[in-house]
């Protein structure tokens, strides 16, 4: 190419590059926003438990708008998934509002409950090592999360602080539902995103 000559770039190519960059920046922004919302939902479980599932749902909703350079959704978070988890979120929020104020503000045992739930979620995601059906993977993640929350709370009731709500005290299941239900829904919505991410990674890796 001779010096001084200019290269003609068609307007369509320039517009395509600008659009691609915008999509990339928007995808990064939405992913960061989604992560921050999930962090906020975990924080809310300790003091503002009523809004924790809502923050987790919004994080999942935001993630559904993430697209690749071609404009296609990165994760197949469809309207069926969003509608189902919206209903679950509304149910758990209403049940939390119906709890007495002292119970809603109580943080007793939340470290054990959340620790058990996160551990169960992580173990449930390991179902990819022996399961291939997506529905079975969802079920594995959900059951493992519920089991983790239950075992975490059961472990807490064996500590000196947890003895007043130990099994047989009359408060065990009531407190477990009051704290475990919002925690489960909050973690499971994160689990839905992680299941889809791992499933796509496995498909692309074949």
Describe each model-derived feature in a short phrase.
Residues 24-31, 76-90, 139-141:
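Structural signature of hydrophobic alpha-helical transmembrane segments
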Residues 87-129:
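Helix-adjacent hinge/juxtasegments
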Residues 37-45, 93-105, 157-158:
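C-terminal ends of transmembrane helices
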Residues 35-57, 65-67, 122-134:
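Transmembrane alpha-helix interface/packing and boundary motifs in multi-pass membrane proteins
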Residues 49-56, 85, 131-155:
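Selective recognition of hydrophobic, aromatic-rich stretches within alpha-helical transmembrane segments
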Residues 168-185:
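Individual transmembrane alpha-helices with interfacial aromatic-anchor signatures
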Residues 11, 15-44, 116-122:
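Small-residue-enriched transmembrane helix starts and helix-helix packing motifs
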Residues 191-206:
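Juxtamembrane boundary at the C-terminal end of a transmembrane helix
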């Amino acid at each position: 190419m001779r010096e001084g000559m200019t290269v003609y770039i068609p307007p369509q190519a320039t517009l395509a590059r600008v659009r691609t960059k915008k999509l990339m920046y928007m995808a990064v922004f939405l992913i960061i926003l989604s992560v921050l919302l999930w962090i906020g939902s975990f924080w809310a479980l300790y003091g503002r438990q009523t809004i924790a599932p809502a923050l987790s749902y919004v994080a999942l909703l935001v993630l559904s708008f993430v697209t690749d350079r071609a404009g296609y959704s990165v994760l197949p978070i469809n309207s069926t998934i969003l509608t189902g988890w919206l209903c679950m979120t509304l149910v758990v929020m209403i049940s939390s509002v119906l709890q007495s104020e002292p119970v809603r503000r109580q943080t007793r045992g939340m470290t054990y409950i959340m620790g058990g739930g996160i551990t169960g979620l992580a173990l449930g995601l390991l179902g990819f090592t022996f399961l291939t059906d997506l529905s079975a993977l969802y079920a594995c993640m959900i059951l493992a999360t519920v089991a983790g929350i239950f075992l975490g709370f059961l472990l807490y009731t064996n500590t000196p602080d947890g003895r007043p709500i130990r099994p047989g005290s009359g408060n065990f299941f009531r407190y477990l539902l009051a704290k475990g239900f919002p925690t489960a829904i909050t973690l499971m919505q994160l689990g839905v995103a992680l299941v889809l991410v791992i499933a796509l990674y496995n498909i692309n890796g074949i």
